[in-house]
């Protein structure tokens, strides 16, 4: 074989190889988006910027998805649904020579019922659901073959590549198609989404938005309720929360450019979490409760149970000190020399602050004004409440045989009780007389030193019963007498020091012992007589 023949065969093979390596252009709406090899290339058809793609999946009861696809030779090619992709990848050789094909839009949306448990908990607690990856995969598999709506005027095509041109000639045609492209259009459409506060949405309604196409066709977009995230700020503190909102469409044209605005307006019937809030708290003490208002701040806590995240918002009072009033009507105990009763009085506040181990405590004390409700009465400031009964201590000094005793009698404060005639009175319990308990030592004789320190406690209670001169006091209406039963015990005794002998007198109670012994002998003597009776 001649050398020339070998070179001729090699040249023919090289020419054939060069002919097979052909570049093609990928067109979207007759606009070139990529140049790839016909045999090995994949056309990345990019969806126009005016078309949105999104993927939001919370559960099978709440999702909002929009994606695109095309069909070439009975094979379906989708965008990346999970990542809200906007590129349809199609092998160039599959579409080459098939002409322009349309692509389709799929929009799937489902919202929670406004009165459902999940919707209410989300609004009140700001709950953020956690979705498992398997649930998302199963959901995508169930919707990836959903039939969509063809977008009018939007096509995908693979044609021969013409260097230096943004649009290429269709396959099998030598004539340029630039005159058919939309690059010479004088108008463009820009879509944007804006989330605003509810104050600018008062005039927006739930009507549908209508857009008119170039061919006179109209597209009606239904306005649905969606969940949006808004940010609220107060006192230099901001926080985000989710609320339902409705969409409102607005259109403006500037220098031939048409802009379509989509504004989501939060529904005003849902309350948002405030950085500070005035709340009402109830304070209780001694079986009495009262309400007061204090400023509180929100505290957020998050718990996770079985993969479900729950967020709680608790308002905590800024300070535990109640709102101090300049004057306040309080319940007090008024006493004279013989009786005590409950009444009301106007009091003024006194604030006291103490610090113990770094903890600051604020106290508010209300002190009654004036000397008493009637002449001769004073307010008791050391009343004691026990088992629902109020007692007021009263100290009395008693001097016997040169010794002075201080007795503390607890007077029972009784409330008004009805009489037989239907009238009411407030009996007061007298200060019981200080008497020595049986077996108690007598006070020391003259000249004794001060010795023991005990207290005398008198418990007295006014009760209806038989009246005797020894146990009655004046206190009823029209001079009526009130029966009083008293119980006295000695708990404190102060013996005054007198001049004379420095020795303390000791009482042996011999008389009491002798009387007790005599009674015992008489009882023993009567025992034998019982056998003869």
From Swiss-Prot:
Glycans are attached at residue 115. Residues 163-214, 427-451 have a biased composition (Low complexity). The GPI-anchor is attached to the protein in the endoplasmic reticulum and serves to target the protein to the cell surface. There, the glucosamine-inositol phospholipid moiety is cleaved off and the GPI-modified mannoprotein is covalently attached via its lipidless GPI glycan remnant to the 1,6-beta-glucan of the outer cell wall layer. Disruption phenotype: Leads to increased adhesion and biofilm formation. Its main location: secreted. The keyword Glycoprotein applies. Residues 161-219, 418-451 are annotated as: Disordered. Induction: Expression is greatest during yeast exponential-phase growth, but down-regulated in stationary phase and upon filamentation. Expression is also increased during growth in hypoxic conditions. Expression decreases in biofilm cultures and becomes undetectable through late stage biofilm formation. Up-regulated when the extracellular phosphate concentration is low or in presence of Cis-2-dodecenoic acid (BDSF). Repressed during cell wall regeneration. Expression is positively regulated by EFG1 and EFH1, and negatively regulated by SSN6 and SSK1. Residues 1-21 form the signal peptide. Keywords: Cell adhesion, Cell wall, Glycoprotein, GPI-anchor, Lipoprotein, Membrane, Secreted, Signal. One of its GO terms (biological process) is cell adhesion. InterPro entries: Flocculin_t3_rpt (IPR025928). It is found in: Secreted; Secreted, Cell wall; Membrane. Residues 512-533 form a propeptide. The keyword NADP does not apply. Cell wall protein which plays an anti-adhesive role and promotes dispersal of yeast forms, which allows the organism to seek new sites for colonization. Belongs to the flocculin family. This is Yeast-form wall Protein 1. It comes from Candida albicans (strain SC5314 / ATCC MYA-2876).
